[in-house]
């Protein structure tokens, strides 16, 4: 599999290099679908200019990236294009090896359950085979050729760096490295705050890996959870303190995390926040900011309860929720959870609306620049048009993720109770998710 992966890497780098040298690079870097006030490369350049002048990059209201990012590019500004290409390649490689290991774990678990007769007798067609799972890691690595990923890289959106950190968190978690998992999760949280919700699936997987039961009365459960929480918190504290020593100031905390949570910049993007708060009376904004922000965090506990035996699927759902409900989303965020679709290709037969929802997402992606042009340049449309397509895009994503969630639970139920269900009167029964 090394040769196909190398081919994917070569093709991906070639496409990116060609686009970097084309006239499209400038156009892409200004697209509101691709960059946000948090991840815009132009804002990073302005922050670097202020730093070179001996002024805090957070003294204005323009730069909102983390201190480690600005110091990284302070030394690598001349190689920025190469940095972003390497970042994307590292993300794909990390996902490739993570899913390769995950498939081995899934197959071993499936084999054990078959030996213990935990599956119903008529579910042979639902059992996954090694041949079926062989090419899944390579399909995941095709993340590199996703148009969303390519656009994000060419625009030099710092979202790509956050994706890399999350990918390495997933890899180290699946490998069972408790310390590195905590470190990469801390880095991802430091970079964009919302990955803190990935703590729960990461912990659940590591508990599973250590054969520790997820039980409130289990002493081993609490000891391990405490150790992992301390590693994560300690890593985060060290990173934040390092940022303070670099800047000799705490200005970055309100400028980065306060900015993410309070959503003061209402520049249009593909998210749900900007239009709503642009139209709202100021004295209501704090309440509704809290209501909107809680969406990212609210689902973590019920999902942890429902999917405690399936932490990687939980992780996939949580990454999707972050990309939909975060305050400043871009297409780069969407690309990360889309990379996991091949992992769940065995759910395809249970998906109810996959064709319609795929069409909605593709059509919305094509209409974003059209409606933006009609609004901003032609003047023949207004913000309602652009927000309508944004809303449709996000509703499409929500329904798609809900469809995968339903399909996953349906397959798990069939594995235990049998594929062909019958009611008490002997007629064919229908499985309903409530």
Curated annotation (Swiss-Prot):
Q: Which residues lie on this side of the membrane: Cytoplasmic?
A: 1-3, 100-136, 205-221, 306-310, 345-353, 406-434
Question: Partners and quaternary state?
Answer: Heteropentamer. Part of the GPI-anchor transamidase complex, consisting of PIGK, PIGT, PIGS, PIGU and GAA1.
State the gene name recorded for this protein.
Pigu
Topology relative to the membrane, per the entry?
Multi-pass membrane protein
What organism is listed for this UniProt entry? Answer: Mus musculus (Mouse)
Alphabetic keyword roster: Endoplasmic reticulum, GPI-anchor biosynthesis, Membrane, Transmembrane, Transmembrane helix
What is the protein name given in its UniProt record?
GPI-anchor transamidase component PIGU
Residues reported in the UniProt entry to bind a cardiolipin: 215, 308
Q: Which InterPro entries match?
A: PIG-U (IPR009600)
Signal sequence bounds: none
Pfam families, alphabetized = PIG-U
The cellular component terms of Gene Ontology attached to this UniProt record, alphabetical and capped at eight, are: GPI-anchor transamidase complex
Localisation per UniProt entry = Endoplasmic reticulum membrane
Write down the superkingdom of origin. Eukaryota
Q: In which pathway does it act?
A: Glycolipid biosynthesis; glycosylphosphatidylinositol-anchor biosynthesis
Residues assigned to the Lumenal compartment are 23-78, 244-285, 372-383
SS bond partners: none
One BP annotation, GO? GPI anchor biosynthetic process
Question: Which of this chain's residues are annotated to bind a 2-acyl-6-[6-phosphoethanolamine-alpha-D-mannosyl-(1->2)-6-phosphoethanolamine-alpha-D-mannosyl-(1->6)-2-phosphoethanolamine-alpha-D-mannosyl-(1->4)-alpha-D-glucosaminyl]-1-(1-radyl,2-acyl-sn-glycero-3-phospho)-1D-myo-inositol?
Answer: 382, 384
């Amino acid at each position: 599999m090394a040769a196909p992966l190398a081919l994917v890497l070569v093709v991906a780098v070639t496409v990116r290099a060609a686009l970097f040298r084309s006239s499209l690079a400038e156009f892409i870097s200004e697209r509101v679908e691709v960059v946000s006030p948090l991840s815009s490369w132009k804002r990073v350049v302005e922050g670097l200019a202020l730093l070179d002048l001996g002024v805090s990059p957070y003294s204005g209201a323009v730069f909102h990236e983390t201190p480690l990012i600005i110091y990284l590019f302070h030394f690598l500004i001349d190689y920025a294009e190469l940095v972003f290409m390497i970042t994307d390649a590292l993300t794909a490689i990390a996902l490739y090896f993570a899913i390769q290991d995950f498939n081995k774990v899934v197959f071993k678990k499936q084999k054990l359950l078959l030996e213990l007769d935990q599956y119903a007798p008529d579910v042979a067609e639902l059992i996954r085979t090694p041949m079926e799972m062989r090419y899944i890691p390579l399909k995941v690595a095709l993340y590199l050729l996703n148009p969303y990923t390519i656009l994000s890289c060419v625009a030099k959106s710092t979202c790509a760096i956050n994706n890399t950190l999350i990918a390495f968190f997933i890899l180290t978690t699946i490998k069972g490295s408790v310390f590195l998992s905590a470190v990469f999760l801390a880095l991802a949280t430091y970079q964009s705050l919302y990955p803190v919700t990935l703590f729960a699936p990461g912990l659940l997987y590591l508990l599973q890996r250590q054969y520790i039961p997820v039980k409130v009365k289990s002493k081993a459960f609490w000891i391990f959870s405490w150790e992992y929480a301390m590693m994560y918190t300690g890593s985060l504290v060290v990173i934040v303190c390092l940022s303070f020593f670099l800047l000799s100031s705490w200005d970055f905390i309100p400028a980065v995390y306060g900015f993410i949570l309070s959503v003061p910049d209402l520049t249009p993007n593909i998210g749900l926040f900007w239009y709503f708060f642009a139209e709202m009376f100021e004295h209501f904004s704090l309440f509704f900011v809290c209501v909107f922000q809680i969406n990212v965090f609210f689902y973590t506990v019920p999902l942890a309860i429902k999917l405690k035996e399936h932490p990687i699927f939980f992780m996939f759902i949580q990454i999707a929720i972050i990309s939909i409900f975060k305050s400043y989303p871009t297409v780069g965020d969407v690309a990360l959870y889309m990379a996991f679709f091949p992992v769940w290709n065995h759910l395809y037969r249970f998906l109810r609306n996959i064709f319609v929802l795929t069409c909605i997402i593709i059509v919305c992606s094509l209409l974003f620049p059209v409606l933006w042009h009609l609004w901003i340049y032609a003047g023949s449309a207004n913000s309602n048009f652009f927000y309508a397509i944004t809303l449709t895009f996000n509703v499409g994503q929500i329904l798609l993720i809900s469809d995968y969630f339903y399909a996953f639970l349906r397959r798990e139920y069939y594995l235990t109770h049998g594929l062909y269900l019958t009611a008490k009167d002997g007629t064919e029964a229908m499985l309903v998710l409530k």
